[in-house]
Every structure is written in C-alpha cells, then in structure tokens.
Amino acid sequence: MVVINGVKYACETCIRGHRAAQCTHTDGPLQMIRRKGRPSTTCGHCKELRRTKNFNPSGGCMCASARRPAVGSKEDETRCRCDEGEPCKCHTKRKSSRKSKGGSCHRRANDEAAHVNGLGIADLDVLLGLNGRSSDVDMTTTLPSLKPPLQNGEIKADSIDNLDLASLDPLEQSPSISMEPVSINETGSAYTTTNTALNDIDIPFSINELNELYKQVSSHNSHSQ
C-alpha cells in the first residue's frame, strides 16, 4: 500500500485479491483505495453540523456535488451556499414533534361529572339503561317532587284519624260479635252445653221399656238353649 498525500493507493491486482494492505507494487498503475461500505453522500461540512450542533438536513447534501441544480433555476436560488463561504441554510435546528392535545383527561372527567350531576333521577335511569327505552320513562319524576319524611316532632295526635283502618270495619259492622269480656263461668257452661248436645242421642222409648225388652230377649235366649 502506497500513501501519497494522506491518500492510500494500491495496484488493481492487489485490490481485487483483497491484498491492498500488503501491496508494494509501484511499477504499475495505482488506484485509490476506497473505504469499505457504501460511499457517503454527505460532505464533511454537513456531517460536522449534524454531529456537533444537532442539525438535521432538509434533504440530500448538495454541497460540492455533481447533482447541483442548474444556475438560475428556482432550486439554485434556494440552495445552500455554505461551500461558497455563505452561512449554511440547508440545515435547521431539530424541533420536538410533540403535539398539544385538545384537552386533558382531568378536564374531560370534570365535564362528565358535571353533566351527570345536572341530570334528574329519570335521566340517570335512561343513561344507565335501567328502565329500557327513553319513551317508556316518565321524565316528570324528579328528586325535588318527592316529599321529605316526617320528623318525630312533626307527628300530631290528630293524624291518627287519617290512618287507613279498613281492616277493622268488618268487626265494627258485625252485631253478633261482642267486644265485652266473657267470664270463666259462662265459658264453662257453654262448654258443657256443647258437650251434652253432641253426646246425647234421642231414643223413642224410656228406660223402663228398655229393661222390659231386655228381660224378654234374655228369657227367649235361655229357652232356645
């Protein structure tokens, strides 16, 4: 390998045989040894700006390149002339790509809570789907229409007259049932009367006639034996 002015050279035979580092052939034509990999399309100036100043090129590097646009064209007027000693215009400072959201999650949660607080009882049922379709719900029923429960101090004695005592009406209208207390003697006499009425049997003849009939039957049985 021959170094001339900081550039490495080798013969074509050694370059093709991957022996450029051991090449000492100076008697033939030499070729410049290229770096491994793809050739760089960016000049050293653009590389330095990207590495040190965090600049981002807007496009491919056109500095000292054969792809430079024609003189006088629109692209030539807007191109960077940093290679001519002017300030570099082909690079811009990188900007953060963060986008501001329309609204924070906390604000949306507060709006939803305020909307729910403004609804009535029926509106909440419809919103939660408890009562089915909204057409079947009476929207006039709201919380303020309900009466508050009575406190202990507000109950009056005359309010007992307004109670529904329909279950006591049959007892008051039936005259056969007496509300007076019954004594023990009356209860016992009623019990004995009931028992005699159930145990007695009506017989069409008296006890004497039964005795006479029994004597006749017994004598008849004795004769037959």
Curated annotation (Swiss-Prot):
One of the protein's GO biological processes: intracellular copper ion homeostasis
Please list the residue ranges the record marks as binding DNA: 1-40
Q: Where is the signal peptide?
A: none
Where in the cell does this protein reside?
Nucleus
Q: What PROSITE patterns does the database record attribute to this sequence?
A: COPPER_FIST_1, COPPER_FIST_2
Report residue spans for region: Binds copper and DNA: 1-108
Tell me which domain of life the UniProt entry assigns to the organism this sequence originates from: Eukaryota
According to the UniProt record, which cysteines are disulfide-bonded?
A: none
One GO MF term, please?
DNA-binding transcription factor activity, RNA polymerase II-specific
Q: Which GO terms describe its cellular component?
A: nucleus
Question: Can the keyword Nucleus be found in this entry's annotation?
Answer: yes
Residue numbers spanned by region Required for transcriptional activation = 109-225
Q: Please name the SUPFAM superfamilies in this protein's record.
A: Zinc domain conserved in yeast copper-regulated transcription factors (SSF57879)
Any keyword Secreted?
no
Q: Which sequence ranges are marked TM in the entry?
A: none
Binding positions for Zn(2+) per the UniProt entry: C11, C14, C23, H25
Q: Which InterPro entries match?
A: Copper_Homeo_Regul, Cu_fist_DNA-bd_dom, Cu_fist_DNA-bd_dom_sf
UniProt keyword list:
Activator, Copper, DNA-binding, Metal-binding, Nucleus, Transcription, Transcription regulation, Zinc
Miscellaneous: Present with 1760 molecules/cell in log phase SD medium.
Q: What does this protein do?
A: Trans-acting regulatory protein that activates transcription of the CUP1 gene (metallothionein) in response to copper ions. Binds to the CUP1 UAS sequence 5'-GCTTCTTTTCCGCTGA-3'. Binds DNA only in presence of copper or silver. Copper seems to alter the conformation of the protein.
Q: What is this protein called?
A: Transcriptional activator protein CUP2
Q: What does the organism's lineage look like at the top?
A: Eukaryota, Fungi, Dikarya, Ascomycota, Saccharomycotina
